[in-house]
Design a protein with these regions (language model features):
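Short beta-strand/turn micro-motifs at beta-sheet edges
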Residues: 201-205, 324-329
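Acidic-enriched catalytic cores of C-N bond-cleaving enzymes acting on peptides and small amides
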Residues: 181, 196, 205, 226-318, ...
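A generic structural motif
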Residues: 130, 221-223, 341-349, 378
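Active-site-adjacent substrate-binding region
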Residues: 244-245, 252, 385-394
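Active-site metal-coordination/substrate-binding segment of hydrolases
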Residues: 89-160
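Histidine/acidic-residue-rich, glycine-tolerant segments that coordinate divalent metal ions
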Residues: 153-235
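N-terminal helical capping/dimerization or prosegment-like subdomains
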Residues: 2-107, 334, 338, 351
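A short beta-alpha structural unit
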Residues: 341-344, 371-387
Length: 394
């Protein structure tokens, strides 16, 4: 039966899902944080309308779709599929996904584009397809496969948002609004994470939290010639580096303050040892390394723990610096960097954000003007021990 399901889902992908995802890739459905005119241009709504239109053409029995749009909030798509009548299920399955995207950024291969789908070596490239436009389409394709093969399934519901890449700030309101429609949920499926390989099903047992914000350092009112100022005026980027050194050991990448860390249990360590043994060097081969760059650690288990249960800092943006092409001999008046810190799943993000601001702004070097503006603080998540029935199913 599993082979029949696989063949049916593969057929649905080849004949329907892939084309729907190609259309989705062509939509510049940027999340609100990256498109201030999202409501005016209507692209997020168009992404939901396309998804709804596709779903209603699939012939799924008992399907109902509804776009929910509250004033000033990004829209959501509510989906419901009745349980099959030949077997009674007490609780429902909940599907989660999102249809908003992050900006395309730079670095695309010459033969690929953010907004034009390309299939190469059996893989589909384009912005937003894997994060995570496919979630909606594959969830319903799975339900359709069960119905086509006569396999009973429980009632299925879903609430697909368009604000995930902007911290899902509207989603909780929609969940409360749809609480009666959603009913009693027995299983939540979110197709929005990573996998170790394409040979087996991977289940995410935890996700790190996140905090982020901007650090601004100002030393001058206007830029001045570096020949006149250097050696007297402290350089703003130098101060930024010193502030970041309060958080991260730049030699190792280790986060220094204990407030951002947690104790890793023996069970978590054991799980990661098992994954490391299964994947080996594929853990490192998954990344597009340049030249002879080496990983922070060559120990596969430690690398997995770094990625899942330890805090890590990333600088994601910078203002106050001209491009190299346009850079002259000027000492710039300020530097602003945007940072993101992944947090262990059980660390309180709000407390960590407050601590970060205190660490950054305390006793500014050279009494420079230092500001930290938090932009996000999201808690992580760690799954409870799986119920026996779902462990058996997997």
């Amino acid at each position: 039966m599993l082979k029949k399901i696989y063949n049916k889902v593969t057929h649905e992908w080849d004949t329907s899902v892939e084309e729907a995802l190609k259309s989705f890739i062509r939509l510049p459905a940027l999340s609100p944080d990256f498109d201030k005119k999202w409501e005016e241009n209507g692209v997020l709504l168009k992404a939901l309308e396309d998804a709804q239109a596709w779903a209603e053409k699939q012939g799924i029995k008992g399907l109902r779709c509804e776009i929910i749009k509250d004033d000033g909030f990004t829209p959501c798509l509510f989906v419901e599929v009745d349980a099959t009548s030949d077997k009674k299920f007490e609780r429902s399955v909940f599907f989660y996904g999102h249809l908003d995207k992050q900006p395309p950024n730079e670095g695309w291969d010459p033969d690929k584009s953010a907004w034009e789908p390309v299939i190469q070596n059996g893989r589909l490239y384009g912005r937003g397809a894997v994060d995570d436009g496919y979630a909606f389409y594959t969830s319903l394709a799975a339900v359709k496969a069960l119905q086509t093969l006569g396999i009973p399934h429980p009632r299925c519901v879903g609430l697909f948002e368009t604000c995930e890449e902007s911290s899902s700030r509207h989603y909780e309101s929609y969940l409360k609004e749809a609480e009666q429609k959603l009913g009693d949920i027995g299983l939540v499926i979110a197709l929005d994470s990573c996998c170790g390989d394409y040979d087996r099903l991977w289940v995410t047992s935890s996700l790190r939290g996140m905090l982020g914000g901007t650090i601004e350092v100002r030393t001058l009112n206007v830029g001045v010639h570096s020949g006149e100022a250097s050696g007297i005026v402290p350089e703003s980027f130098m101060i930024v580096r010193r502030l970041l050194d309060r958080i991260e050991d730049s030699r190792t990448g280790e986060i220094i303050p204990r407030v951002f860390q947690t104790k890793i249990s023996e069970e978590i360590h054991k799980q990661n040892v098992g994954v490391a043994e299964s994947l080996g060097d594929r853990i490192f081969a998954a990344y597009p390394w340049h030249g002879k760059t080496e990983p922070l650690t060559k120990d596969a288990c430690e690398a997995l723990l770094n990625r899942s249960w330890r805090p890590e800092l990333t600088v994601t943006g910078v203002d106050g610096m001209p491009s190299v092409e346009n850079a002259g001999n000027v000492m710039r008046p300020y530097t602003t960097v945007k940072i993101g810190m992944r947090l262990p799943p059980d660390v309180d993000a709000e407390k960590a954000s407050t601590a970060l601001e205190e660490i950054i702004t305390a006793e500014p070097p050279f009494n420079a003007d230092v500001k930290y503006v938090p932009t996000v603080a999201s808690n992580g998540w760690s799954a409870k021990a799986a119920a026996p029935w779902i462990t058996k199913a997997f």
